[in-house]
Design a protein with these regions (language model features):
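Conserved small/polar residues in nucleotide/adenosyl-binding loops
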Residues: 232-234
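Long, structured ligand/cofactor-binding scaffold of large enzymes
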Residues: 1-102
Length: 234
């Protein structure tokens, strides 16, 4: 199974279909056949400032449950799980742990920054400046337009970036796969490798419980402290 949070609801997931395709090629090259399943996610950024944020955390749990349903309803030999963002990455990791089937997580990468290293987190500051009439509406609209120039997780060390790093530190994602810029060809190449490795895990009968051990979690905690990642991962 190739499970992903692909969808058009926000830039973090809009490109994941391309990674799904690459993972499928990797699976095919190793003698397997991919079945693509999708449970798209919401964007915490879009959910802020209104009642939408009340649905954020529960969306993670429902996504994990739906992925479990997908796998249990039609048994598979292995899985590639592909996601980028705040609730989708934890949801995929939860599903992987629950299912304990040979599986690999493929991070969806990170979007590049806008002009002058503009990122989405700065829009709140510019919004306040606009309300105080310190910048013009035209300036504010330019910032809003350029804050998310392409696909991938938001380009700052928030929940999405943190969880991609944590997946790699836990050993459930390929080394070097976290936070690859989404516009680079290396991201697709890594997705294909993830598909290839999934077949290897199945043949070796290597499960997440064999990989995400106490030592792996201790390693992830140390990596988190070393990089000063977001505390919301807890």
């Amino acid at each position: 199974i190739v499970e992903s949070s692909y969808g058009h609801s926000h830039p973090g997931s809009a490109h994941l279909d391309k990674l799904v395709d690459e993972a499928g090629i990797g699976i095919k090259e190793k003698g397997g056949r991919a079945a693509n399943y999708f449970v798209t996610d919401i964007c915490d950024g879009e959910a802020q400032g209104h009642d939408g944020m009340n649905y954020s955390l529960v969306s993670r749990d429902i996504m994990a449950a739906m992925m479990e349903i997908h796998v249990k309803a039609t048994p598979f030999d292995a899985g590639v799980f592909i996601a980028s963002c705040d609730k989708s990455v934890p949801a995929h990791l939860m599903a992987i742990a629950r299912l304990d089937m040979p599986a690999i997580f493929m991070p969806g990468g990170i979007m590049k920054a806008g002009p002058n290293l503009l990122t989405l987190e700065q829009i709140g500051t510019y919004s306040a400046q606009y309300e105080r009439k310190e910048i013009t509406e035209e300036q504010f609209m330019v910032y809003k337009r350029d804050a998310c120039p392409d696909c991938g997780a938001c380009s700052f060390m928030g929940t999405a970036s943190t969880m991609q790093v944590m997946a790699e530190a836990l050993g459930i994602a390929l080394p070097g796969s976290a936070l690859i810029p989404a516009h680079l060809p290396e991201l697709k190449e890594t997705a294909r490798k993830a598909g290839e490795h999934a077949l290897g895990l199945a043949r070796e009968e290597l499960k997440p419980s064999d990989i995400m051990t106490i030592q792996a979690f201790e390693n992830a905690i140390m990596v988190h402290a070393a990089i000063a990642l977001s505390l919301i991962h807890i």
